[in-house]
Amino acid sequence: MHDTASIFHADLAVPAVIRTAPGIFVQGRRIRSLVFSTDLAVICHCDADAVLAVYPFTCQPAITQALVAASQRPVLNGVGGSITHGERCIEVALHSEMQGVAGVVVNTSIPIDTVEALAAKLNVPVVVTVCADDAVAARQIEAGATMVNVAAGGRTAEVVASLRSRYHELPVIATGGRTDEAIARTIEAGADAISWTPPDIRVLERAVMEKARRLAAEQLEA
C-alpha cells in the first residue's frame, strides 16, 4: 500500500531564492512564487504558492474550472488583452470569479475602460501585465489595477525598480529569469513575488524515459 505522502510530492521545486521575496497576500495567503503554466500535471507536481494561468486564447470556463479544481492553491487567471476585451472580457472575468479564481490577469494592451470596469465589478484583484513603467502602465494603475505583473524580458529588474520607486505599496509580481542571480536581482529591485516557468513537459518526460531505459538495461545485465 502506497503512502499518500510518497504519491503527492513536488517533483518540480521552485528555485529556493524565490522564498526570499516578501510576498503578496491573496485570499489570506502569502504568495511568493507562482508557477506560470496551464498544464495540470505540472501544476499538481510543483510546490509554487500559486498558479499564473495565462494562455494565448480567449479564456474558456471549462479550462478555468479544471485549473481551480486541480490546483489546490490560488489561481490568477488570464481573462483578456489584445484578443479579448470590452464586454466579453468583463463577462469572462465575472464568470472566473464565480468559479473561484483568486485574481484575474489582463495584458498591457487592454483598453483603459475595460480595466475600470473590471475594477468596479470584481471583488478579486485585477492584475495588469506590463512591459515598461510608462504612461500606459500609469493609466492602467490609475484606472484600478490592484497589482502589476512585470514581464519585460532582460529589462524586468529595471522596470520593477522604476515602478517600485513610484508606487511604494503596489503589489508587484515579476518574471524572475532563468538563473538564481537574475531572480535575486528582480527581488532586490522590488518584486514582491516571482512567476516561475517550469521546464517543458517534453524535457521532463525525456529525463524519465532516459532513466527508464537505463534501468531496463541494468536489469538485462543482472
Tell me the role of every PLM-derived stretch:
Residues 87-96, 134-144, 178-196:
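Catalytic cores of alpha/beta
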Residues 117-121, 162-163, 184-188, 199-222:
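C-terminal helical cap(s) of enzyme catalytic domains, especially alpha/beta-barrels
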Residues 99-111, 146-159, 189-211:
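Glycine-rich phosphate-binding active-site loops on the catalytic face of alpha/beta enzymes
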Residues 23, 70-82, 119-129, 165-175:
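Short beta-strand/loop segments at the ligand-binding rim of alpha/beta enzyme cores
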Residues 1-77, 81-88, 98:
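Conserved N-terminal beta1-alpha1 strand-loop-helix module at the mouth
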Residues 29-35, 50-57, 78-85, 101-111, ...:
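Catalytic beta/alpha-barrel core
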